[in-house]
């Protein structure tokens, strides 16, 4: 997922700057992942049921991880814990010498109260928290910081590709480059609203009969609902030859890159969204984005400048028609979109903000700080 993509580049960059940085991963069984998927949905506002057996599996998995990672975590000056999966680790390190920070990548603006109440028991003991947007931040008894995610322009998913590779992608997935293409890249998750995307496509196709839709996503090992959603998407697609539903392997970065470059318009019609790295990825490739009016999409998609935010399939269909019928506007929006990402959402900015945070955490109580 997006968090892993960021860390794959962020950790080596920190190491290149001389920091002794490492990235540790916890492992759990299917019950653990059912529980953490429930946490994820609950933080985003779903009314979820979490049986005691799920919570027990969650706490036991974190205990086992604490035993495995104990030496590493105790010796760290700064520990950043990402999202709910390992949030309970902190309870096993009472009196820790380093600074512990909980980093929430999820839209926590309107969480399901019982889920947040349970997680808050762990989160409130951290030294600080990071959220992606001010709207996501929760009231906590420690400093809360805002750091937006980012993309790496040198990642395989974002580098320039040769024309031959892009044309091979058209061929591989039987897409006609002479006809308009709309694309959504996301895991198969109800919050990403793939069924709403299909509805939007069908409405727009009444006016643009040549329109093609690509829904591309991968399997997330920590998302037990993905297969059911994929089945629903395939059923909704029916036998329409102009809808391509692609289940891609986790390392299909160049394929996703090529698909984004193939598309005329990229959609991210999420109902809830933490940030939406696929939005920044598409904008970096000069594609206007039609996105759900939610979460981090709002700070990336600026109406009439980098794309449009919408609240319904009808709204998305209207914007698809508008852009495809006004190619000059589509091109200008794409140019603005890339410039906006360059200024705001590249990993160099993200790294700078992390380094600033580390400095504040380690030296913020000093009245005078001498550099050098």
Predicted regions and their residues:
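A short, well-ordered alpha-helix in the C-terminal region of glycosyltransferases
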Residues: 322, 329-343, 350-356, 360
């Amino acid at each position: 997922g997006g968090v892993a993509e960021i860390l794959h580049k962020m950790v080596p960059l920190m190491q290149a700057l001389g920091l002794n940085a490492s990235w540790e991963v916890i492992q759990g069984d299917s019950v653990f992942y059912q529980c953490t998927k429930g946490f994820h949905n609950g933080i985003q506002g779903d009314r979820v049921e979490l049986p005691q057996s799920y919570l027990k599996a969650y706490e036991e998995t974190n205990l086992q991880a604490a035993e495995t990672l104990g030496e590493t975590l105790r010796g760290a000056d700064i520990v950043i814990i990402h999202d709910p999966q390992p949030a309970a680790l902190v309870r096993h390190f009472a009196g820790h010498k380093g600074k512990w920070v909980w980093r929430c990548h999820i839209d926590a603006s309107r969480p399901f109260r019982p889920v947040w109440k349970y997680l808050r028991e762990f989160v409130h003991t951290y030294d600080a928290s990071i959220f992606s947007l001010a709207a996501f931040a929760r009231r906590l008894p420690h400093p809360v910081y805002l750091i937006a995610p980012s993309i790496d322009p040198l990642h395989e998913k974002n580098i320039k590709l040769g024309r031959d590779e892009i044309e091979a992608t058209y061929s591989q997935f039987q897409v006609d480059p002479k006809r308009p293409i709309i694309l959504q890249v996301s895991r198969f998750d109800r919050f990403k609203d793939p069924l709403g995307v299909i509805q939007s496509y069908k409405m727009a196709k009444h006016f643009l009969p040549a329109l093609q839709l690509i829904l591309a996503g991968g399997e997330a090992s920590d998302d037990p609902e993905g297969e059911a959603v994929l089945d629903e998407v395939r059923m909704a697609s029916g036998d329409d030859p102009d809808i391509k539903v692609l289940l891609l392997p986790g390392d299909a970065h160049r394929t996703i890159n090529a698909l984004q470059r193939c598309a005329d318009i990229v959609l991210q019609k999420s109902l809830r969204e933490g940030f939406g790295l696929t939005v920044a990825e598409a904008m970096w490739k000069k594609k206007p984005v039609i996105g759900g009016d939610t979460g981090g999409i709002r700070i990336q998609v600026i109406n009439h400048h980098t794309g449009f935010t919408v609240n319904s399939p009808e709204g998305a269909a209207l914007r698809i028609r508008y852009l495809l019928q006004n190619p000059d506007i589509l091109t200008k929006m794409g140019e603005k979109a890339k410039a906006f990402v360059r200024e705001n959402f590249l990993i160099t900015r993200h790294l700078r903000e992390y380094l600033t945070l580390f400095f504040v955490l380690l030296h913020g109580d000093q009245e005078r700080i001498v550099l050098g």
